[in-house]
């Protein structure tokens, strides 16, 4: 199993599937369709049935039931795209066998070092096989580890018919990282009663709560005048943006929050005297606090527009997804069965809220309750991203055990 996981994973991460928020297409980048087509071929090769990919890059396939019992159809999902935070082009995965607990030099020329001083959780991986970047790209374990684990689990079940299971559906979706994954996902065609995203982090993670999420695009329209004659005429759009940000509570940012604490996050700010643009994301687990955060953003925009004149501040505020706990708690047994599967494999479940989002958050609101299971990766979205091969083995085994337990309990 280890060899197959390593071979598939290192193949998939070399396909550049970074999504693009500026694109209106679906998928937003051609690399995602390239990987989708690769997976379609491989799904057919291992013996999956009803293998399809649509024009938008959604891959679906079926592993038929091998039991006479009436077992609910379950699904496993992972996303094709990688994050926009750092390039996913020319990923060169590095394999470090029998990790010794010391610094790992990712890139000598650029002096990029993965160090337990900065990332103390590395101590958990002594003796393990780590797959890292070369220090110039992200790795793409988010979520190609999940894709790999689903592929290997399905191949294992096909080759081990003694493990009884109901009908299993798998899906690989585009553009999750920019919040569009479920937009064109056909829940009815997928046909599962419950599903799981393999999109979590370290070993044991199990999540069924997510942020409520919104995005705020703000355009500041200034007035550029020659600085020599600018008195009482110039309006500096960049300074307007800075003034806007000064109204955001500085301790309510990602770098100062954890657990159930929400935040405002300034993703980007660019512009000049004439015009500046800022993009914030707004996150909170509590719906009332989420609404209050959006109201605060809107009130700052209104206040500044009143100060600088009509049309000086333009705000576009849109909800992205909601906390999936509301949709999963009524069917909490689907979380409990994963906890049982993990314990059967000597994994201690670590149930915590997702300080982020998965396709499962939106899918749960489309009628498909979808908790999130660990994929094994650490330090997602950056050059220090890595995954332990042994964690990928465990995630694969969890998929297999969940399928077995669903059949056993009927």
UniProtKB/Swiss-Prot annotation:
Domain of life, per lineage: Bacteria
Cofactor binding mode and count: Binds 2 Zn(2+) ions per subunit.
UniProt GO BP: peptide catabolic process; proteolysis
Binding of Zn(2+) 1, residues: 79, 142, 199
EC number: 3.4.11.4
InterPro entries: ArgE/DapE_CS (IPR001261), Bact_exopeptidase_dim_dom (IPR036264), Peptidase_M20 (IPR002933), Peptidase_M20_dimer (IPR011650), Peptidase_M20B (IPR010161)
Subcellular location: Cytoplasm
Keywords: Aminopeptidase, Cytoplasm, Hydrolase, Metal-binding, Metalloprotease, Protease, Zinc
Catalytic residues identified in the record: 81, 176 (proton acceptor)
Residues binding Zn(2+) 2, per UniProt: 142, 177, 381
Transmembrane segments: none
Function: Cleaves the N-terminal amino acid of tripeptides.
NCBIfam families for the chain: peptidase-T, PRK05469.1, PRK13381.1
UniProt family annotation: Belongs to the peptidase M20B family.
Protein name: Peptidase T
Species, as recorded: Listeria monocytogenes serotype 4b (strain F2365)
């Amino acid at each position: 199993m280890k060899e197959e996981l390593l071979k598939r994973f290192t193949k998939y991460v070399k396909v550049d599937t970074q999504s693009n928020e500026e694109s209106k297409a679906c998928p937003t980048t051609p690399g995602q369709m390239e990987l989708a087509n690769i997976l379609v071929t491989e799904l057919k090769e291992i013996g999956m049935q009803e293998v399809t990919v649509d024009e938008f890059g959604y891959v679906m396939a079926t592993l038929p039931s091998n039991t006479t019992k009436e077992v609910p159809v379950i699904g496993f999902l992972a996303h094709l795209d990688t994050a926009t935070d750092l390039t996913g082009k020319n990923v060169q995965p590095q394999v470090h066998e029998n990790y010794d607990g010391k610094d790992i030099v990712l890139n000598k020329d650029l002096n990029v070092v993965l160090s337990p001083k900065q990332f103390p959780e590395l101590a958990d991986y002594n003796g393990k096989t780590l797959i890292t970047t070369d220090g110039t790209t992200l790795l793409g374990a988010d979520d190609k580890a999940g894709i790999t684990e689903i592929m290997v689990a399905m191949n294992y079940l096909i080759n081990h018919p003694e493990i009884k299971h109901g009908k299993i559906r798998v899906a690989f979706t585009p553009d999750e990282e920019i919040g569009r994954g479920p937009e064109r996902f056909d829940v009815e065609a997928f046909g599962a009663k419950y599903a799981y995203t393999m999109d979590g982090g370290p070993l044991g993670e199990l999540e069924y709560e997510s942020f409520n999420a919104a995005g705020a695009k703000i355009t500041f329209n200034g007035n550029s005048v020659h600085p020599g004659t600018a008195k009482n005429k110039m309006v500096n759009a960049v300074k307007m943006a800075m003034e806007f940000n000064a109204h955001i509570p500085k301790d309510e940012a990602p770098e100062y929050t954890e657990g159930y604490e929400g935040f405002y996050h300034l993703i980007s700010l660019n512009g000049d005297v004439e015009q500046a643009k800022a993009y914030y994301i707004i996150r909170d687990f509590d719906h009332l606090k989420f609404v209050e955060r959006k109201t605060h953003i809107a009130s700052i925009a209104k206040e500044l527009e009143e100060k600088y004149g009509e049309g000086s501040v333009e705000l576009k505020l849109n909800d992205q997804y909601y906390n999936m706990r509301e949709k999963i708690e009524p069917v909490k047994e689907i979380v409990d069965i994963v906890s049982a599967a993990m314990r059967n494999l000597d994994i201690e479940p670590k149930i915590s809220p997702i300080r982020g989002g998965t396709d499962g958050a939106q899918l749960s609101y489309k009628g498909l309750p979808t908790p999130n299971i660990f994929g094994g990766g650490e330090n997602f979205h950056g050059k220090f991203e890595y995954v332990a091969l042994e964690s990928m083995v465990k995630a694969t085994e969890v998929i297999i055990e969940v399928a077995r337990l669903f059949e056993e309990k009927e």
